[in-house]
Design a protein with these regions (language model features):
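N-terminal leader/targeting and accessory segments in enzymes
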Residues: 1-48, 52, 194, 220-225, ...
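Glycine/threonine-rich flexible loop motifs
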Residues: 7, 11-13, 143, 164-171, ...
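Short, structured coil segments at secondary-structure junctions
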Residues: 21, 32-34, 149-150, 183, ...
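Short, polar loop motifs at secondary-structure junctions
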Residues: 22-32, 94-97, 191-195, 212-213, ...
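Short loop/edge segments at beta-strand edges and connector loops
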Residues: 27-28, 40, 94, 136, ...
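Phosphate-binding loop of NTP-binding sites
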Residues: 46-191, 195-206, 258, 267, ...
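Adenine nucleotide phosphate-binding catalytic loops in nucleotide-utilizing enzymes
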Residues: 167-174, 201-311
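ATP-dependent carboxylate-amine ligase
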Residues: 204, 259-272, 276-448
Length: 448
């Protein structure tokens, strides 16, 4: 397969491939080779070929895709839980892990590449799965990894700036997201998002909307209670009222729970069954995850790595914070640089103490990344600290925290490593916190 990548054009290897024994090459460009099979889009052809070689397992499953800047992991997990609790064995693919029934499998990419994806789907079919819930990333959609899949349902959570290092412009980013809804029988759309109408316009199937504020939506949330450890609300549609509780704070948790419930109900699940499943669902690993410790302050780990994501998490934690709200965060290297000062500004607006550190600097100088973040902050603040070493930054956060404070470790979430230079170094923030506090090793997180 001759695929044009950002740093390498596979067409340049076509002659060598034939010389090495390949029977033919599939190309997007005319190369003038004898055994050349030309296609309009080699990425699309690659995905479709992988599907065919695995005997099209995607046609034997109810395919549900979830896309958006924030909330994908939580929403897919909740949908998977609802379907599983209703007796439908379900494959979950996403950022944190791939889960086949009750078996956790490692996850490399948010959305697997075609060979891995169809191998996983084929395995799911052979083991009796009837549905697949997957996170559909913008890169996967732009690269055509999901070409040829007719989704039974597609869910839109929200869209804010992210991945501009890959897409170039925000409009390109939005356009990539819209692709999911062009091939879905059902579109579940968050009407609270400013770009919702664009998603609706791109949708080819039935459209169902939900909102936390707009009565014109098909499903609305009423009598919302934002508590320190959960949200409660009434899911209202055509006169039917279902009481929902989900163990995660913040208004965005209402939106996530709504997205999952609305999707499940429109796939045939009874509203009361969806509500019961949500009520017993735990927070997802690395998403507003509370570290169990004996400290007189709270320690929260969250994957927030965008300006909007960081703002939403800080706002969610504020009501339950009796003391100072302390945030520790950095920004990824070799990624969208324009969001760095915006992350700094969000932290300054909503946190009482800020510790700027490293995330995954990759090939960039961590000090340069931190400098970009600081451009969005008030450098005169006495409660703004810089510590490039993330472990040392966590020590600083915990050693200076006082009773009643809330410490948010943002950006890493479920990740248990740091990418520094060309190395992947171990860093489990849960264990780091426990070690600093002199606590024993955690034997494992409870099942979600």
């Amino acid at each position: 397969m001759c695929i044009r990548h950002r740093s390498f054009d596979g067409h340049t290897a076509a002659v060598d491939a034939l010389a090495s024994g390949a029977a033919a090459v599939v190309t997007q460009d005319r190369l003038g080779l004898e055994n050349e099979l030309r296609v309009a889009d080699s990425r699309s052809a690659y995905a479709r070929l992988c599907a065919a070689l695995c005997n099209h397992p995607e046609r034997k499953l109810r395919m549900i895709g979830v896309t958006g800047t924030n909330g994908k992991t939580t929403v897919t997990t909740l949908i998977r839980n609802i379907l599983s609790d209703s007796g439908t064995k379900t494959l979950l693919t996403g950022t944190v892990c791939n889960r086949l029934g009750d078996e956790n499998l490692p996850s490399g990419l948010t959305t697997p590449k075609p060979p891995e994806l169809y191998s996983l789907l084929s395995r799911a079919v052979s083991q009796g799965c009837k549905a697949c819930v997957m996170e559909a990333s913008s890169q996967a959609l732009a690269q055509g990894r999901l070409e040829g899949i007719d989704f039974d349902a597609a869910v839109f959570t929200n869209i804010t700036r992210d991945h501009l290092d890959y897409h170039g412009t925000f409009e390109n980013y939005v356009s990539a997201k819209k692709k999911l809804f062009e091939h879905s029988a059902l579109s579940i759309v968050n009407l609270d998002d400013p770009r919702a109408n664009e998603i609706i316009a791109a949708s080819k199937g039935k459209i169902i909307t939900f909102s936390t504020v707009l009565d014109c939506a098909d499903y609305t949330a009423k009598n919302i209670s934002l508590l320190s450890d959960c949200v409660r609300f009434e899911l209202v549609s055509k006169g039917h009222i279902e009481h929902i509780e989900f163990a995660s704070p913040g208004l965005f948790s209402v939106s996530n729970a709504m997205a999952a419930a609305v999707c499940a109900v429109n796939l045939g699940i009874e509203p009361k069954d969806a509500a019961q499943s949500l009520a017993k669902s735990k927070s997802v690993c690395g998403r507003l995850e509370r570290v169990e410790c004996s400290a007189p302050y709270s320690v929260i780990i969250d994957y927030a790595h965008t300006p909007d994501g960081l703002e939403q998490v800080l706002r969610a934690l504020r009501p339950s914070c009796r003391g100072k709200l302390i945030v520790l965060f950095g920004c990824g290297g070799d990624r969208d640089k324009t969001k760095r000062p915006l992350m700094g500004a969000a932290a300054c607006k909503y946190a009482d103490k800020i510790i700027v550190t490293s995330d995954n600097p990759r090939s960039e100088d961590p000090i340069k990344i931190i400098g970009d973040i600081l451009k969005g902050t008030d450098k005169k603040r006495r409660d703004l600290f810089v510590e490039p070493d993330r472990r040392k930054a966590i020590v600083l956060a915990l050693k200076t925290a006082e009773p009643g404070d809330t410490v948010l470790l943002a950006g890493k979430g479920h990740e248990k490593y740091q990418l520094i230079g060309g190395e992947k170094l171990p860093l489990d923030e849960r264990e780091t916190v426990r070690k600093i506090l002199g606590l024993p090793h955690d034997t494992g997180r409870k099942k979600q």
